């Protein structure tokens, strides 16, 4: 299985992140195209689109910025790296799932 790491920004876009959104959206198109190309060889290709995940990058954000981000997430919490890892393991083990983008974002992109 091939699992690409995209972002909800590739699904939704974001102010001031046109370059990042374009690259992540491109990765989604790439995932779907490659999935079609290699499906007949029993190779599955999917993408994960994380939302706000607690990390060193988010740790430096001010409380004001974090609160503004949390206000946009229906589940009102940031994701954890372990949750993304669990999803990765799940996708790696699925024999009948290909060409999909799975958002793990607390409902942000719905």
Show where each model-derived region lies.
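Conserved catalytic-site region of short-chain dehydrogenase/reductase
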Residues: 10-12, 110
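Active-site helix of classical SDR
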Residues: 23, 31
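Alpha-helical segment proximal to the catalytic Tyr-Lys
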Residues: 36-40
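Residue(s) in the substrate-gating loop at a strand-loop-helix junction
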Residues: 7
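Short, flexible catalytic-loop segment of classical short-chain dehydrogenase/reductase
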Residues: 11, 28, 45, 49-59
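Hydrophobic structural elements of the Rossmann-like NAD(P)H-binding subdomain
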Residues: 3, 45-48, 58, 99, ...
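Catalytic Tyr-x(3-8)-Lys segment
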Residues: 64-83
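C-terminal substrate-recognition "lid" of short-chain dehydrogenase/reductases
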Residues: 78-104, 109
């Amino acid at each position: 299985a091939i699992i690409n790491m995209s972002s909800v920004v590739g699904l939704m876009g974001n102010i001031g992140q046109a370059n990042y959104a374009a690259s992540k959206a491109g990765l989604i198109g790439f995932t779907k195209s490659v999935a079609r190309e290699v499906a007949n060889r029993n190779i599955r290709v999917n993408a994960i689109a994380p939302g706000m995940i607690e990390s060193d990058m988010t740790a430096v954000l001010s409380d004001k910025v974090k609160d503004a981000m949390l206000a946009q997430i229906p589940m009102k919490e940031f994701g954890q790296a372990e949750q993304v890892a669990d999803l990765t393991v799940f996708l790696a083990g699925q024999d009948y799932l290909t060409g999909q983008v799975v958002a793990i974002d607390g409902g942000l992109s719905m």
